[in-house]
């Protein structure tokens, strides 16, 4: 398919989802065009057969069309332009569609909630990947070249320059999250950013680092700015809800002057008194749970084995707050490489299908087109084009991923926990230089590479033995 998404393809998709009048919203994540629909019964599931479409996920109120990285953003932009030219519906049609949309929302509340995480974090993912890659490459060069932290010269300066982006991102990440979260929950982004900044300020007048807020208690009550990303998400949600309530009774002439002012005062009070302590407890509980799962080999196997299923249902974005919590508590994201084993297991399954298929079959052509993205960590083409339509290979791919997760869990259990140097990043082979551990980058890279190899081989063996029986290999 060409680099640009053809208007003919988008018009065909638009027709098969029920036309412009059936579209409630248009957006994208890293690999998918996401179309909110009023009536899912009007959607033709054969969209997945269109040339250039790598897969389709249907929910009660959304159609997710898999295009791949980069293409999804261009598709969403072009689709928005097409929808902007669509005729306006009359009030009766809009009312009827809103009723159907409300009903759909009531039947998929969990998916609707998790979809918010995609809205909040997807715009940040390119930055996570770029900063993480720069940090990983700089760390690898420093390790190989034996560059110490206090070294002087052109090379150390260049390496420090490459690392500064990661420091900047994670120092002020909560402000970006607060802005996006407030918007996602229906509020004003800058209000969420201001509230998030309260979690960054220091409240100890004797501290020598950070930014002192100017007071150390809240009307005599101690301030404990814990919770980080969890607290910020709760505070941003509260900020958006309060803003909506204030705006209901605020006269239009005073809206710009007073709505945000009142919203910030109320939300900040709640943040200092309730949200910061609550966020801290939730943050500690979540970190404890996943740190113990990560150090439990069986827990790692279960997480890796189920992750492909989470991707299929579109709820994998719900892990991002966990990634951020682990970054704060461990200094690296130990969950991400475990979940990445799911994609590696699928690569092994696809190679087994390729080996068992006829030389000139369509299956071999499908695998050839999807295997390189799979090796580089983009799994949707393999999921929706190769394994999931045949079901058994999808199950054996999950088992292969579980084997890779078990391997990483065993190594962590034996004393070498490792993880991604960023909250989010690429998976597959591209993620190798982003691995880190207390023992250094090279041992972490070796563990990750070993996990990928185990997942490849296990996925291949499981699929060869159990995933090809009574399966269409044409």
Curated annotation (Swiss-Prot):
It catalyses: N-acetyl-beta-D-muramate(out) + N(pros)-phospho-L-histidyl-[protein] = N-acetyl-beta-D-muramate 6-phosphate(in) + L-histidyl-[protein]. Pfam families: PTS_EIIB (PF00367), PTS_EIIC (PF02378). The active site is at residue 29. Its EC number is 2.7.1.192. InterPro entries: Glu_permease_IIB (IPR036878), PTrfase_EIIB_Cys (IPR018113), PTS_EIIC (IPR003352), PTS_EIIC_1 (IPR013013), PTS_IIB_1 (IPR001996), PTS_Sugar-Specific_Components (IPR050558). Residues 1-123, 179-180, 239-260, 323-334, 390-393, 462-474 are cytoplasmic. Residues 145-157, 202-217, 282-301, 356-368, 415-440 are periplasmic. Coiled coil: none annotated. GO terms for cellular component: plasma membrane. It comes from the Bacteria. GO terms for biological process: phosphoenolpyruvate-dependent sugar phosphotransferase system. The chain crosses the membrane at residues 124-144, 158-178, 181-201, 218-238, 261-281, 302-322, 335-355, 369-389, 394-414, 441-461. It is found in: Cell inner membrane. It is a multi-pass membrane protein. Keywords: Cell inner membrane, Cell membrane, Kinase, Membrane, Phosphotransferase system, Sugar transport, Transferase, Transmembrane, Transmembrane helix, Transport. Residues 115-474 form the PTS EIIC type-1 domain. Residues 1-89 form the PTS EIIB type-1 domain. The phosphoenolpyruvate-dependent sugar phosphotransferase system (sugar PTS), a major carbohydrate active transport system, catalyzes the phosphorylation of incoming sugar substrates concomitantly with their translocation across the cell membrane. This system is involved in N-acetylmuramic acid (MurNAc) transport, yielding cytoplasmic MurNAc-6-P. Is also able to take up anhydro-N-acetylmuramic acid (anhMurNAc), but cannot phosphorylate the carbon 6, probably because of the 1,6-anhydro ring. The EIIB domain is phosphorylated by phospho-EIIA on a cysteinyl or histidyl residue, depending on the transported sugar. Then, it transfers the phosphoryl group to the sugar substrate concomitantly with the sugar uptake processed by the EIIC domain. This is PTS system N-acetylmuramic acid-specific EIIBC component. It comes from Escherichia coli O6:H1 (strain CFT073 / ATCC 700928 / UPEC).
